[in-house]
Amino acid sequence: MKKVLSVCAVLVFALSCIFAQSISEKSEERKTLTVYAYDTFCGDWGVAGSVIPAFEKATGIKVNLVAAGASVEAINKVRLEGANTRCDVIVGVSDDIADKAYDLLEAYNSPYLETIDQSLRFDKENRLIPYDYGTFAFVYDSESGINPPQSLMALTMEEYRDKVILIDPRTSSVGAGLLMWTYNALGDGWKDWWKTMSANALTIASGWSAGYGLFTEGEAPIVISYTTSPIYHVMYENTTRYQALLFTDGHEATIEAAGIIKGTKHRSEAESFIDFLLTDAQIDLANANSMYPVNSTIELPEAYDYAPVPGKIFTTSADKTSELINQWTETIAK
């Protein structure tokens, strides 16, 4: 009898352990969030070192941050993975490539949407929630000795041969932004500009991280980036060496957003993450990404004085962006 009781006790203990482990695993599952982001969001220059730890501390939710390449590559990764994707939230989807992601996302009417200016809320269905914005610009190395160009067409001149780094519109939101910029500024001449620059530029990088890395390594003194890019160098390197150029053509605007993936099993955690981006993380996001916060009440550091403000700004719809990328692929990327 004692042996039977002993065996039963062991069985009860074992089942209790299994049950406790199951509960623990479920609890852990509820407290985990997988976020896909473009590489620089996850890297040394990005948000991983500040925003993610702060979110984890504030909420108790563990974030699995996945560097998925450039923004378009991150979208494509989710699409290719289909129902098997681990992704709960995708960040870094800009307004000019938004139509590539809409069908992958669930709407979320965050209570903090009211802090965002209506002009920045490009998705009326709230599948993509803006968290920062800026304008594209060419950044140059003021110690390189070159004469800084003042327009898009100036870049096609022989004196800038092999001195400019561009980015591919098919794989990067920065490249897509440059494409829209040339279209809005040059009209029908945008194709000729790209044909000339394809030969004149040092390279057309696959993403911003690769392109800007080549620039800071001294491979070329000019790179496509943002008017706000000098902020990083002022804040973290204490240098004004790298400066954004204001062109007479005007500049293309961009808005970065995050969205919740359809079918996520961590909807509550995903909502908490989006809300955090719109509140506590706003200044850290702006500083880490060298962009402007969407919440206009945020007080900006003095380093933002080094970001020039364009007098003329363009915006382009996502469907037009897709159309032009197709044309670019057919005529330029042959």
Question: Could you say what each language-model-derived stretch is?
Answer:
Residues 96-100, 216, 220-241:
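A ligand-binding cleft/hinge motif common to bilobed small-molecule-binding domains
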Residues 134, 162-171, 195-198, 204-205, 237-262, 276-299:
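Periplasmic-binding protein-like
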Residues 21-89, 284:
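Conserved N-terminal structural module of periplasmic/extracytoplasmic solute-binding proteins
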Residues 1-33, 334:
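Short, low-complexity disordered leader/linker segments with a strong preference
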Residues 137-144, 183, 254-269, 285:
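A bilobed periplasmic-binding-protein/Venus flytrap-type ligand-binding module shared by bacterial periplasmic
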Residues 34-48, 69-73, 85-220:
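Extracytoplasmic ligand-binding site segments that recognize negatively charged/polar headgroups
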Residues 190, 296-334:
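An extracytoplasmic/periplasmic, membrane-proximal ligand-sensing/linker region
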